[in-house]
Structures are given as C-alpha cells and as structure tokens.
C-alpha cells in the first residue's frame, strides 16, 4: 500500500527542495469532480410561472425542497423560485399574497451549469453569487436536474475526507 501512495505523491509533486513542493498540474485533472456525479438519478421538481403562491408553498412542502425550477414543460427554464423568494415577497404584501403568481417572485436570469461543470467551480459561483440552487442543463439548455449548495458541500467534504485518509494511511504505514 505504501508503494501506491509513494507513486501518487511522486506523480503529484514533480519538483521539490527542502522548503517547497511544486504540484504537477497535469495530475490535478484527475481530482476534478464533475456535477454529473452528483445528479445522476436525481429528480428535479418544476412549477408553472402562472401557479399561485399557495401552489408554490405547497409544492415546496410536498417535495421537501428549497427551490423549484419554473418551466412550462419540464425542459425549458423560465426561472427559479425559492423559499427565500417567498419570504422576500411577504413584507408589505400580506393582504395580497393569495393573488401573487410565481412569475412575480422568480429569478428570471437563472445561473445554470452542465453535467461537465466542476464541483469546485460551481462552489465558487454559488458562494460569490450567494445562491443555493443551480439547475443542471444539457447543451441545448434543457433542464436535466438541480444541484443544491448542500450537494456541493457534501461532495467537497467527501473529497477532503478521501484525501485525508490517503495521507493518514501513507504517514502511518
């Protein structure tokens, strides 16, 4: 087992002296986790832009999700609407909430990713833009799935745990 990790480390580190290590950028490619690995078999819930706020709240509750993709057909994306959008709509509008439609609450300029997007780059975008849900689309822009910040964080934690275990095994062997 020690040989395996020595080979891995020597492949990752291509040059070193007593104080510095230089990582081989070609070897870093294999560490890239793709969005596709997180959304395989994951169902995405959608809602119509003409649905009522009542319909939206019920759908969020029934499906146990924090956001729904707004779509007329389950493929094309018109927007995304989340629990935060519902909360933001409430101040000053409590009397008229029964008349509010999803298209009034949704974010129409939707940030999306593809199955080939890296989880690391998606984490950066979600953090910088302060968004918690990103629809996953194919090359034609059709909806495939949705990924949450929780999915991204779990993948990152798993990646760090594997790396920690590998280093621990190497040091202890």
Label the predicted regions.
Residues 2-173:
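Tandem CBS (Cystathionine beta-synthase) repeat/Bateman regulatory domains
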């Amino acid at each position: 087992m020690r040989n395996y990790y020595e080979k891995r480390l020597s492949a990752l580190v291509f040059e070193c002296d007593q104080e510095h290590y230089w990582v081989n950028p070609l070897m870093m490619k294999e560490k890239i986790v793709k969005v596709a690995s997180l959304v395989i078999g994951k169902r995405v819930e959608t809602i119509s832009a003409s649905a009522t706020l009542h319909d939206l709240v019920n759908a969020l509750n029934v499906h146990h999700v924090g956001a729904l993709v707004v779509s007329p057909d389950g493929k094309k994306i018109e927007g995304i609407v989340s629990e935060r959008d519902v909360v933001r709509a409430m101040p000053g509008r409590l009397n008229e909430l029964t008349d509010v439609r999803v298209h009034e609450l949704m974010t129409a300029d939707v940030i999306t990713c593809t199955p080939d997007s890296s989880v690391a780059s998606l984490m950066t975008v979600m953090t910088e833009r302060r968004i918690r849900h990103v629809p996953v689309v194919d090359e034609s822009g059709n909806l495939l799935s949705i990924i949450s910040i929780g999915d991204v964080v779990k993948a990152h934690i798993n990646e760090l745990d594997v790396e920690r275990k590998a280093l621990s095994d190497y040091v202890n062997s």
